[in-house]
UniProtKB/Swiss-Prot annotation:
This is ATP synthase subunit b 2. It holds the Pfam family ATP-synt_B. InterPro entries: ATP_synth_B-like_membr_sf, ATP_synth_b/b'su_bac/chlpt, ATP_synth_F0_bsu_bac, ATP_synthase_B_chain. It is a single-pass membrane protein. It comes from Marinomonas sp. (strain MWYL1). The lineage of its organism: Bacteria, Pseudomonadati, Pseudomonadota, Gammaproteobacteria, Oceanospirillales. The gene is atpF2. Keywords: ATP synthesis, Cell inner membrane, Cell membrane, CF(0), Hydrogen ion transport, Ion transport, Membrane, Transmembrane, Transmembrane helix, Transport. One of its GO terms (molecular function) is proton-transporting ATPase activity, rotational mechanism. Belongs to the ATPase B chain family. HAMAP family: ATP_synth_b_bprime.
Length: 156
């Protein structure tokens, strides 16, 4: 056999093999490589997206935490103000009650003093009439006695 014919046969066989590979083998391999490349790109994009989402979620979480702290501080401040207000109201109520009790006690004392003065006036007038009877040596009748006592009580 001739070397040229063998070489030509091998070249034709190689060309058929290349054509067969390009027609039937290469497209699935290229498709698999492209699919793999696309999956890798999608994975990288998903990782980037997840990273951005994580950063966004962390920012939102920190913002919510900050707002919660502000709300808690505001609620505590309002509670403290309300507690102080309640204490002030209680103090005012106690002061008002004390003043009212003091005034009531003062009024009761004044009434007791007035009653004591009235009783003292009555006793003084009785003693005065008794002394006057002894001095005069005569008895004054009850009607005249009560009129004089009332008149003296009014004058005193």
């Amino acid at each position: 056999m001739n070397l040229n014919l063998t070489l030509l046969g091998q070249a034709i066989s190689f060309a058929i093999f290349v054509w067969f590979c390009m027609k039937y083998v290469w497209p699935p391999v290229i498709a698999a490589l492209e699919e793999r490349s696309k999956k890798i790109a999608d994975g990288l994009e998903a990782a980037n997206r997840a990273s951005r989402d994580l950063e966004l979620a962390q920012e939102q979480a920190s913002q919510i935490l900050r707002e919660s702290k502000e709300n808690a501080a505001e609620i505590i401040e309002q509670a403290n103000k309300r507690a102080n207000q309640m204490v002030d109201e209680a103090k005012e109520q106690v002061i008002a009650d004390g003043k009212r009790l003091r005034e009531a006690a003062q009024a009761e004392i004044e009434q007791d003093v007035m009653r004591a003065k009235e009783a003292l006036r009555a006793q003084v007038s009785v003693l005065a009439f008794a002394g006057a009877e002894k001095i005069l040596g005569a008895t004054i009748d009850e009607k005249a006695h009560s009129e004089i006592v009332e008149q003296l009580a009014k004058e005193l």
